[in-house]
From Swiss-Prot:
Positions bound to ATP: 9-16, 35, 124
Protein's organism: Burkholderia mallei (strain ATCC 23344)
Keywords: ATP-binding, Cytoplasm, Disulfide bond, Nucleotide-binding, RNA-binding, Transferase, tRNA processing, tRNA-binding
Active site: 100 (nucleophile), 196 (cysteine persulfide intermediate)
Highest classification ranks of the organism: Bacteria, Pseudomonadati, Pseudomonadota, Betaproteobacteria, Burkholderiales
Protein name: tRNA-specific 2-thiouridylase MnmA
InterPro entries in the cross-refs: MnmA-like, MnmA-like_C, MnmA-like_central, MnmA-like_central_sf, Rossmann-like_a/b/a_fold
Transferase keyword on record: yes
UniProt-listed Pfam families: tRNA_Me_trans (PF03054), tRNA_Me_trans_C (PF20258), tRNA_Me_trans_M (PF20259)
Entry EC no(s): 2.8.1.13
Amino acid sequence: MTKRRVVVGMSGGVDSSVTAWLLKEQGYDVVGLFMKNWEDDDDGEYCSTRQDWIDVVSVADLIGIDVEAVNFAAEYKDRVFAEFLREYSAGRTPNPDVLCNAEIKFKAFLDHAMSLGAQTIATGHYARVRERDGRFELLKAFDHTKDQSYFLHRLNQAQLSKTMFPLGEIPKTRVREIAAQIGLPNAKKKDSTGICFIGERPFRDFLNRYLPTKPGPMKTPDGKTVGEHIGLAFYTFGQRKGIGLGGSKDGSGEPWFVAVKDIASNTLYVVQGHDHPWLRSRELVAGNVSWVAGEPPADGARCGAKTRYRQADAPCAFGRAAQAGDERFSLVFDEPQWAVTPGQSAVLYDGDVCLGGGIIESAATGRAGTAPAGRAPALVEAR
């Protein structure tokens, strides 16, 4: 009897390594595939591609599977990184990991896996897939503290039908235990953090390579200039660290936060206090939608939504655009949400089931009547 072939995306980390081992133990014909999505440059201090590949080969040798490497750097640059730069240039804050999953890990990788004779692919993501009534559902992981369905919401039914997430039913602590018990050489390797192509390098230094600095005034809601920013692209809504203000001499002494990026006047507006009304939104509008469930919720439906990773689901009402052909949607939250950021994803849930979502275009904050006279209306963050 021919074994069912599964190609596992292996990164050199513990999660994908345990995924490959679990599937091998379950009797699958497992092939490991290492994706190189970023060309190494002069950042040897930060790029770990070489060591990651060594770890993949070591793990594959231990568990007894074949492994190969494939270079998707060109596809990544065209489909993910170019969009990443466009969004930052426009003053928004994108999430490239969401786009990477949809365009690279579950498109380019899936296509390559099928060419290797695979019936299914698998990754080390913490999520679950369930088939029900001829459709495939994306569910949160059993371990909600590690759930990664937020990053997977742009997958479609075809991609989901060919995908396995073996770690979706397992707590992260158990994954580490398995890695140690079977003697994986990377059992104690730290989880990767940050944007995949940036790694551990300083984000601002990296971004400055591709986007020019364009200094401008940093102002308070009443129009007082309190400093100078280096370029709006280098700040994000709700940012606290790296603003360069500290406590204001004549202010409240509370921390400063980025509140508005005014593209027209190249002005960065900052406010003091985590609970400032300029940082909270009851409504948002999202576009560039994708429904992993196959279709959007009904107009007026109640659901939960995340506007950032690891955020608790926020109860809200879903609204479809009134104009025919407009696929955008609105969300009205029961309670104001903090730092709802254009460029990030608004992802909808019905309990554990991920419905899909879209890219946040705008969010209404408590700024009505408080804007300084003459301020341009082209506000990007929480406009």
